[in-house]
Curated annotation (Swiss-Prot):
Keywords for the protein's UniProt record, in alphabetical order: Cell cycle, Cell division, DNA-binding
Protein's UniProt name: Probable cell division protein WhiA
Function, in words: Involved in cell division and chromosome segregation.
Cross-referenced Pfam families: HTH_WhiA, LAGLIDADG_WhiA, WhiA_N
One BP term from GO: regulation of sporulation
Organism from which the protein derives: Halothermothrix orenii (strain H 168 / OCM 544 / DSM 9562)
Length: 313
């Protein structure tokens, strides 16, 4: 089950006791997934849904609030090599259907189609949340939290998408609107925005999963940064050691290590014996032990002698 399906499965089971909020959620679902049909000059409505829990919820809301007749058709389709149920809820022409369409904001009082959010449905904060939940259930999707953060709403009409974006901005969100494949997409791409929307729609289990994955990402990124830093330091240490060994080899071949002072002879012999040791490790091998800066000072003196030899040749 995809993360989107998990979220929709979770929030499909949420029910509001507020009748206006129920209407707000139903309105958003129909605006996202509904279509108007005309049969013998009479209006009919079809709502296409892809989750059984959601189909039952919409059926129950319409039945309880409007007492309309609803026909349910279920069929299966092959979707990306998996079979998926499609639930078509069909409201045939009948008395009360125009009242229903006006209540959910599909028709205005003059029987014109509306492609905007009905303001009366989103006056309270709780109804605004219900509307966003309905919009997500109808046309929302969210990326797996292990990947990049992305949550979107795919809308049929630009004016409705603009209204939805403005509604989401009331929650302090800054989304974006774009057109893609004849749909108008309202989308968000940051952790905080995705987390806020999951909280708005009541997907608290999904929100916990999102937060858990964020922690894992941060730990993984921290480990990677540390490994990269340690690798870079190791490369630097090895490169410096190779140059030091070249200096020591040059002195040994031309003048002999015995020409060096005792302290320089000691560090030259230790470096040859432990070519990949760090300066700190070399210092601990000396007798008596020497600080990192002391080791570095001796190796710089060896480099100066080697450079003198190079200048003579």
């Amino acid at each position: 089950m995809s993360f989107t399906d998990q979220v929709k499965h979770e929030v499909s089971r949420l029910e509001s006791n507020n009748k206006m909020c129920q209407l707000a959620e139903l309105s958003a679902l129909i605006m996202m997934n509904g279509s108007i049909q005309i049969i013998n000059k009479n209006l009919a409505v079809k709502v296409r849904l892809y989750h059984g829990d959601l189909a039952r919820k919409v059926y129950k809301l319409i039945k309880e609030r409007f007492e309309l007749n609803i026909e349910i058709m279920v069929r299966r389709r092959n979707h990306f090599s998996t079979y998926q149920n499609i639930y078509d809820l069909f409201l045939p022409p009948q008395p009360g259907i125009e009242v229903f369409l006006k209540k959910v904001g599909v028709l205005d009082e003059d029987h014109n189609l509306l492609f905007r959010i009905k303001k009366e449905l989103v006056t309270s904060k709780s109804c605004q949340k219900s509307y966003v939940r309905g919009a997500f259930l109808g046309g929302g999707s969210v990326n797996n939290p292990r990947g990049e953060y992305h949550l979107e709403f795919r809308c049929e009409h630009e004016s409705f998408a603009e209204d939805l974006l403005m509604l989401l901005k009331r929650f302090g969100l800054e989304g974006h609107l774009t057109e893609h494949r004849k749909k108008y997409v309202v989308y968000f791409k940051s952790f905080s925005e995705v987390a806020t929307i999951l909280n708005i729609i009541g997907a608290h289990k999904a929100l916990l999963k999102l937060e858990d994955n964020k922690v894992l990402k941060e730990v993984k990124n921290g480990v990677n940064r540390r490994v990269n830093c340690e690798t870079a330091n190791l490369d630097k240490t090895v490169k410096a050691a190779m140059l030091q060994l070249e200096d020591i080899e040059l002195i040994e071949k031309t003048r002999g290590l015995e020409t060096l002072s005792n302290s320089l002879q000691e560090i030259a012999i230790i470096r040859k014996k432990y070519p990949y040791a760090s300066l700190k490790e070399l210092g601990k091998l000396l007798d008596p032990p020497l600080s990192k800066s002391g080791v570095n000072h001796r190796l710089r003196r060896i480099k100066s002698i080697a450079n003198e030899i190079r200048g003579e040749r």
